[in-house]
Amino acid sequence: MAYVHEDETVRLGESVGWYAGIVENKLKFKDLGNSKEDQLQGKVGMFKSVPFDENNSLNWTISGDVFVGYNKMNRRFLVVDDIFGAKSRYYTYGLGVKNEISKSFRLSEGFSFVPHAGLNLEYGRFSKIREKSGEMRLEVKANDYFSIRPEVGADLAYKHSFGNNNLKVSVGVAYENELGKVANANNKARVAYTTADWYDLRGEKEDRRGNIKTDLNIGWDNQRVGVTANVGYDTKGENVRGGVGFRVIF
């Protein structure tokens, strides 16, 4: 869920604003024990949108935000024929910058085709993870990561106005590739509450190397307030996403 405060100028497509939101993610891992994790993350940030022509067909948008997250993990693992578990809690925090440039081609009165390209940068860190309950508890060292994620895609958008009300619907597909430290973060773990040696953890919870994502967005506004809803799918990890947002324009 998100709140967006936007100040528009007399020039079409030129605006500046800030936003705040809360995101909840529920992860289900494809391991033998079907481990799970719940993530709750809060964000606050600013954005600026700049048009390069009079009708805003070519537009550049940049945004930056800071975030903090609270995570609960239920790790389940199989030993012979029995499933054991261990639970932990940890925190995340960081900051990110997003750049996107888009070009809109009008197909008819209501439909438009919008190809776009972007570059997303993010630095984050997670706290030490020490499982408090369960069998074979693990301890993971605190670590940081740096994400460099270029993206290219296109949207098919529809807009219909009736009075002061606007209805917007878009379907999009995009390709993104992770080039940063996320896919090779060198995380270290050991058996908790012992003097055992540290070892390297293999793999990542979220893999965005060569991901194709699709999105459906539906929005309504009356030029003062608005609401949006979206649902999406990622081929990497077979993730399903969804969210609701609120918007206020001054």
Regions found by a protein language model. Give the residues of each.
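Outer membrane beta-barrel translocator domains of Type V secretion systems
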Residues: M1-F105, T228-R241, G245
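Outer-membrane beta-barrel strand-turn architecture
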Residues: H5-L12, V50-N56, F105-E109, F113, ...
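Outer membrane beta-barrel transmembrane domains
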Residues: G42-K43, V140-F250
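Extended alpha-helical regions
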Residues: A86-L156
